[in-house]
Regions:
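Macrodomain-like recognition of ADP-ribose-binding/processing modules
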Residues: 1-197
Length: 197
């Protein structure tokens, strides 16, 4: 959603409502978490699931070097980096490293208790918010398609995105904040990614 071309869009199909917001992932998650507080007691226990556009081999991407992509931003505003740098998470990064490809894998991690402590401007929040975070890496296309066809690339993206959505559904998450999966530094085509979603 470019600022000039942005239109607030929400579509309801059956029981699914989806939309496009030109917003910070954690800001939108905080807003949605507040809205969920008005739901029934059963649903109050539900947390928002935020997609972390993860680096496949470096925990937190370049957050410790001052990089400014979405993952680094999430890490600076929350407790997420503690989880990503844990020994349990190391398996994810080691596995992706072992593949010796910029495409990464369909592997993902769920961090169920991430405390958001800063707003979109970096200010400390008066009241922190707990969300869940799904970390998954899009293929890095900085070096092109590495010898695969466009159809194979689309199949790979379809599998990865479907895996994320199936995991969220299996774990019972009903409210997801997704992002421009791989459409920044990883150079995936936003039209292809949005079509697959």
């Amino acid at each position: 959603c470019a600022d000039k071309a942005y239109k607030h869009v929400y579509v309801t199909e059956g029981r699914i409502e989806f939309g496009c917001e030109n917003a910070d992932s954690f800001e939108l998650a905080r807003q949605m978490q507040k809205e969920m507080a008005y739901l029934s007691d059963r649903d109050k226990k539900q947390t928002v699931l935020v997609l972390n556009l993860a680096n496949p081999v470096h925990p937190g991407g370049g957050v410790r070097r001052g990089a400014r992509a979405q993952e680094e931003d999430l890490c600076r505003k929350s407790s997420l980096l503690l989880s990503l740098e844990s020994s349990a998470a190391r398996k994810y990064y080691d596995y992706n490293s072992s593949l010796h490809t910029y495409f990464g894998s369909d592997a993902l991690m769920i961090t169920p208790q991430v405390e958001i402590i800063r707003d979109e401007k970096g200010n400390l929040l008066q009241d922190s918010v707990i969300v869940s975070v799904m970390s998954c890496a899009a293929p890095m296309l900085c070096n092109g398609l590495e010898g695969i066809t466009d159809a194979q690339y689309r199949d790979m993206m379809f599998g990865r995105i479907t895996g994320m959505l199936k995991t969220a559904a299996y774990l019972g998450y009903q409210v997801l904040v997704l992002g421009a999966f791989g459409c920044g530094a990883f150079r995936n085509d936003a039209h292809i990614v949005s079509d697959i979603f």
